[in-house]
Design a protein with these regions (language model features):
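Intracellular alpha-helical coupling/juxtamembrane segments of multi-pass membrane proteins
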Residues: 234-259, 263-290
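ABC ATP-binding cassette signature C-motif
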Residues: 1-244, 293, 298-315
Length: 315
């Protein structure tokens, strides 16, 4: 279970989180949403302890393996398949030890653990993941340096998926995938047996793959159960209800204030007016949940340019 308790964090004096709290149950797949700059990627860095929190705490089980994609796979001479296989460090180390161990008891322990982690099907699993992300059998045998940075990002994604971390952090994973790869990833995430947090603007992925939404807004965290469309509906209803309550309270405050203004200096009503004034002072203002205003842009139609628009000379 991932627990975020009273998290506070600021960058250059700008607060991103202020006493924010949330709980993500183990095994849940959660979409992270919020406006650009709200702190989504920062939250991942705080979870991975790359940055220190200013206040509060983020609790992750001590034995949890956390994985994510930070950069593309190196442009090495190692094949794509071997690069992915090497991402499961425990499997890699156990297989290497099995080749050199001579103690019968230790060999038994190694092979038992290899069975537990499904190590012997590793090559088939790695090949299947690479195929899902667009690499055929021939491509899987080629060295990484033969592929562009975008394709090596897919290799890095394949590697972390193969490693099966207990907490998988994905930041806009469909940005470097084609449609087929994105559809495959949606299915993979939905079936993944561990916890997944995925930052994405891909509404389709958030409707097909996740079981909850963590919304970052106003320096806080709010967890919603369900897929993205359910979150959007619930969020809209909450906005409408809060605005309705605010309007009712505003009307009540105006009514009370009008009574006070009218009768506070009238002897027969002064006590009532004073009582109403105290009632007004004790009333906690209801603030509507604000949605930041989206700036609008107007691009005027440009004037035609006289020819020639562009001249290339001895290029």
């Amino acid at each position: 279970m991932l627990k975020i308790h009273n998290l506070s964090f600021a960058i250059d004096g700008k607060p991103l989180f202020d006493n924010a709290s949330a709980v993500i149950p183990t095994g849940h797949k959660v979409g992270i949403v919020g406006r650009n700059g709200s702190g989504k990627t920062t939250l991942f860095r705080l979870i991975r302890k790359e940055w220190e929190v200013d206040g509060g705490q983020i609790e992750v089980p001590a034995d949890f393996r956390i994985g994510g994609v930070d950069q593309e796979a190196p442009a090495s001479d190692i094949s794509l398949l071997d690069t992915v296989l090497a991402a499961d460090h425990e499997r890699h180390q156990l297989l290497a030890e099995a080749d050199t161990a001579t103690d019968a008891d230790r060999l038994g322990q190694i092979h038992a653990r290899l069975i537990d982690i499904d190590a012997y099907s590793g090559e088939a699993r790695a090949a299947s993941i690479l195929a899902g992300l667009g690499f055929d059998q021939a491509a899987q045998a080629r060295p990484c340096h033969e592929f562009s940075g975008g394709w090596r990002m897919r290799v890095a994604l394949a590697a972390v998926l193969f490693a099966q971390p207990d907490l998988l952090l994905l930041d806009e994973p469909t940005n470097y995938l084609d449609l087929e790869g994105a559809i495959w990833l949606e299915s993979f995430i939905a079936k993944y047996k561990h916890t997944v947090l995925v930052i994405s603007h891909d509404r389709t992925l958030l409707n097909r793959s996740v079981t909850g939404i963590l919304h970052l807004t106003d320096c806080g965290l709010t967890y919603y159960t369900g897929r993205y469309d359910q979150f959007e509906t619930e969020r809209r209803m909450k906005l409408e209800q809060q605005e309705s309550l605010r309007q009712k309270q505003d009307a009540q405050r105006k009514h009370i204030q009008a009574f006070v203004d009218r009768f506070r200096y009238k002897a027969s009503k002064a006590r009532q007016a004073q009582s109403r004034l105290k009632q007004l002072e004790k009333m906690q203002p209801i603030t509507a949940i604000s949605e930041r205003v989206v700036a609008g842009f107007n691009f005027p139609t440009p004037e035609p340019l006289p020819p020639p628009v562009l001249v290339l000379d001895q290029v």
